[in-house]
């Protein structure tokens, strides 16, 4: 069996030539559109990379600023209130109103630390302790001395005291 000779029939020759030309034209069209889309994608990726780089720079700048502000705020924190707690008032059978009166008296003695910054109060904490401990307090006509058991310095100054009879 023999393959028919297509070169003798001009209709078939035109058909195959048209197929070849169409294939070449469609291949060039495909390359053009694919290249165009790839250029757009590459430019979009480059823009996004630049945008991400800018955003990362902004984030690092904001983080640095935030860190600096936090450091400044830590330095500038102020004592806003004072709380005093008497730990062993029950041992000496001191009534609740007398405990409250004693705590208020100690608060009045150390109230000058309110609105001072925490750092300066921390530096003078020994003076603050001695101020409380060196004073003799009168409760129900009995003399008591206070001993500072705990001194917590933050925006609230917390003092925990124990008392004993004054000698």
From Swiss-Prot:
One of its GO terms (cellular component) is plasma membrane. It is found in: Cell membrane. Keywords: Cell membrane, Membrane, Transmembrane, Transmembrane helix. The chain crosses the membrane at residues 15-35. Induction: Expression requires the sigma-E factor SigE. It is a single-pass membrane protein. The keyword Cell membrane applies. NCBIfam families: spor_membprot_YtrI. Involved in sporulation. This is Sporulation membrane protein YtrI. It comes from Bacillus subtilis (strain 168). The lineage of its organism: Bacteria, Bacillati, Bacillota, Bacilli, Bacillales. The gene is ytrI.
